[in-house]
Amino acid sequence: MVDDKEKNMKCLTFFLMLPETVKNRSKKSSKKANTGSSSSNSSKLPPVCYEIITLKTKKKKMAADIFPRKKPANSSSTSVQQYHQQNLSNNNLIPAPNWQGLYPTIRERNAVMFNNDLMADVHFVVGPPGGTQRLPGHKYVLAVGSSVFHAMFYGELAEDKDEIRIPDVEPAAFLAMLKYIYCDEIDLAADTVLATLYAAKKYIVPHLARACVNFLETSLSAKNACVLLSQSCLFEEPDLTQRCWEVIDAQAELALKSEGFCDIDFQTLESILRRETLNAKEIVVFEAALNWAEVECQRQDLALSIENKRKVLGKALYLIRIPTMALDDFANGAAQSGVLTLNETNDIFLWYTAAKKPELQFVSKARKGLVPQRCHRFQSCAYRSNQWRYRGRCDSIQFAVDKRVFIAGFGLYGSSCGSAEYSAKIELKRQGVVLGQNLSKYFSDGSSNTFPVWFEYPVQIEPDTFYTASVILDGNELSYFGQEGMTEVQCGKVTVQFQCSSDSTNGTGVQGGQIPELIFYA
């Protein structure tokens, strides 16, 4: 009895994902089947391999809205045109006698059949109304590549139509999936990768789905992390979700100020506002929430009023830790935004100033943020009467990591002759391209300790690639310098390798010199 129930559930799951024509036909056949015995009914259930992974019905955001465009705006249609040209080329090859002999492997011969009308026994009308493409297919090849296609063409509820409509998949994404099934090639583009992931999930092509996720992880940045977080939850990809959180936590202010933040759904907004480890000032969180509310009003066709902004924010407003803002930020920002009621504004002012603090609906405990890690590359430091001097020359070192990290700043030495102030220009480059830089001052107390100098925003560092860390210091006093430098340092779970940089003109290298510490989040 339990087995029958399980089979029925699998059958129902499969049935819900079938095209309407199959559903209607199966309903008619089920009426006929009711006249038979129960054992006969159970024998007609599809086998276990027909179980379908259903996708959530919430609308997925297209990758073209997430990634910076590297192609023209019509690159999706361009992809379809390229596939169409390949279709014409394939068809032109067929009249040649013994064309099979031109290709030594089964993979190459199968590739000729990709997007080819020769021997096609099914056609797909793919895409929403007004944007459809009619694509040829070969049932045997498709069934070998996907258990869903196997069920559609060879299962108990097999589709017997010559033409199948698929309105919920983009043509370019469907073609990318077919190319993988026919040619064993993965051809992904930034503007179609999410749609391809949707197709791979729908038709259970797991290796292609994994490749899509890897593509998204590689392309992940503060600009698209919030939107990808929302999408990764919809696609049920926990590894991608975790990667998104790592970026959002470490580069919170950049992520919150990105255009993509305004495109997230309400549930994702709540998750971000609730996040304990956001590395951001609370006034930035507040302003980001208001920006999201403005766009949400437009999505809901509401007037852009203070009342409507508060309405769409709802209870999420109380996830913003307004009482933890600097008093100036609150007085000049949140208090004058109009979003807070007069009572809320008064109570928060009392929270800042009164000995007896009022009860607030807002969270009053500051976020923990992330704890920075320090990678120290020298085993000792020293000073001599004739070193180390700064004359506006560059101290530089190259480094690489084995895991993605976010460089927040450098730890620098100070004066070896008592207290002194230094002006420091720090810079981080990859293959000559500046990724981050900052000009600031720091005060040293005469000790051999290192003193942190920060970038404006943490810089994302990818694994297995060398980056160049540079600093130009301006100070009159002699400085401490590092000795017994290490080429490889283990910092927690991150391994950092160092090598000399050609940019260094003041004597710094692997064995000794300046830039003793990298400060990072991991």
Swiss-Prot record:
**Pfam family membership, one:** BACK
PROSITE patterns given for it? BTB
What are the subcellular locations of this protein? Cytoplasm, Cytosol; Nucleus
Provide the BTB domain boundaries.
120-190
Main localization category? cytoplasm
Superkingdom assignment: Eukaryota
GO terms for biological process, alphabetical: cerebral cortex development; dendrite morphogenesis
- The gene it comes from is BTBD3
InterPro entries linked: BACK, BTB/POZ_dom, PHR, PHR_sf, SKP1/BTB/POZ_sf
Q: Locate the BACK domain: which residues?
A: 235-300
- What is the stated purpose of this protein? Acts as a key regulator of dendritic field orientation during development of sensory cortex. Also directs dendrites toward active axon terminals when ectopically expressed.
Keyword annotations for this protein, in alphabetical order, are: Cytoplasm, Neurogenesis, Nucleus
- Tissues where the protein occurs: Strongly expressed in the primary visual cortex.
Q: What is this protein called?
A: BTB/POZ domain-containing protein 3
**Organism of this sequence:** Callithrix jacchus
List cystine links: none
Q: Which residues form the signal peptide?
A: none
Q: Name one GO cellular component term.
A: nucleus
